[in-house]
């Protein structure tokens, strides 16, 4: 029974039930597909990055699990079904994979979505989705071979404030699934919802979480993949990227870090006050932010010496990539530019070179001694 409870052949998001099966009748393949596409791993499906970053809970899981190891098992199993990591996606094979979306309509159940393809095609496109969504972790870790699982449930939970999945837009869920299955660009509504959530959370400690940054990066790369004139966003910090929006995001992250060092424990930092303005109307605010940062740098140089000059060099590295070496940005950023800003901001924060900061401090201490 495909709709049976706890079956690997269905998953419900809101009022929509997704049903999937294949001619191979391979339960293990269906389980791995369900976890990679819809649910995530059993122990992390209800816990996303922004919750992890801001949670104060000390509660440990009842059973010790290894998410990296179990993710690797899922990825390798799907690659085995495909043949290998870079195997040719066979769209003519007789082994078929089917996906159906059902939702209530008055007193009836209606078909909202129907898609089919070869097992190779469906599985291959899910793996492509995971590769596109791969990004450096907030702690600066990156595994290019085994990307994290980015299931639909966690994506939707990361970009909508509603915790009840029945309040998520059904059409967006279906369009996201269709884009994954067919290997198409993600729906624009996904980008807009993600940007709105980031702006909504600008006063939180982590407005741009790993998953949100991964989504915006993947959205833009898929959208522009066939345009060789547009540079693809990388998984980690790209110091050669001269896109003004990317540089604005990097610069904002640096200014935030400088303030953290100058005024530890500040109640309302520049992210709380200016993130939304800086990402949407950078031309209005960056001059003021740099003036503010000059005071912070002066304080750091007096108290920590070498660390202040280290931050100076970091800022100059970014400014040198801008026209005229000046932080002169457009008055307004488009949604795509705001997305690039968010990715640049996240990349810079994830890159934070704590070792270099520590060495800058040590150099100053040695000079004093």
Task: Place the predicted regions along the sequence by residue.
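Extended alpha-helical scaffolding segments
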Residues: 1-369
């Amino acid at each position: 029974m495909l709709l049976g409870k706890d079956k690997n052949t269905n998953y419900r998001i809101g009022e929509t039930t997704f049903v999937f099966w294949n001619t191979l009748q391979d339960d293990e393949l269906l389980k791995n597909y369900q976890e990679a596409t819809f649910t995530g791993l059993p122990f992390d499906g209800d816990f996303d990055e922004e919750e992890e970053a801001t949670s104060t809970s000390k509660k440990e899981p009842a059973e010790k699990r290894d998410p990296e190891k179990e993710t690797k098992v899922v990825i390798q199993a799907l690659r085995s079904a495909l043949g290998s990591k870079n195997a040719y996606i066979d769209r003519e094979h007789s082994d078929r994979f089917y996906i159906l979306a059902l939702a209530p309509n008055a007193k009836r159940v209606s078909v909202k979505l129907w898609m089919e393809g070869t097992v190779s095609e469906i599985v291959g496109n899910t793996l492509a989705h995971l590769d596109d969504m791969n990004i450096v972790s907030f702690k600066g870790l990156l595994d290019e071979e085994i990307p994290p699982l980015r299931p639909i449930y966690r994506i939707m939970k990361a970009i909508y404030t509603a915790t009840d999945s029945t309040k998520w837009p059904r059409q967006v869920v279906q369009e996201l699934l269709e884009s994954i299955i067919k290997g198409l660009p993600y729906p624009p509504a996904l980008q807009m919802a993600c940007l709105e959530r980031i702006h909504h959370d600008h006063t939180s400690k982590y407005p741009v979480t790993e998953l949100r940054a991964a989504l915006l990066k993947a959205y833009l790369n898929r959208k522009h993949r066939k345009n060789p004139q547009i540079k693809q966003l990388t998984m980690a910090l790209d110091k050669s990227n001269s896109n003004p929006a990317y540089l604005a995001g990097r610069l904002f992250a640096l200014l935030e870090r400088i303030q953290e060092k100058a005024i530890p424990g500040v109640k309302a930092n520049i992210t709380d006050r200016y993130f939304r303005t800086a990402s949407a109307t950078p031309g209005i605010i960056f001059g003021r932010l740099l003036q503010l940062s000059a005071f912070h740098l002066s304080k750091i140089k007096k108290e920590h010496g070498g660390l202040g000059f280290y931050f100076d060099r970091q800022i100059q590295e970014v400014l040198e990539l801008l026209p005229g070496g000046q932080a002169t940005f457009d008055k307004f950023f488009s949604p795509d530019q705001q997305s690039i800003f968010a990715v640049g901001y996240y990349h810079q924060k994830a890159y934070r070179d704590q070792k270099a900061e520590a060495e800058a401090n040590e150099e100053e201490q040695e000079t004093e001694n």
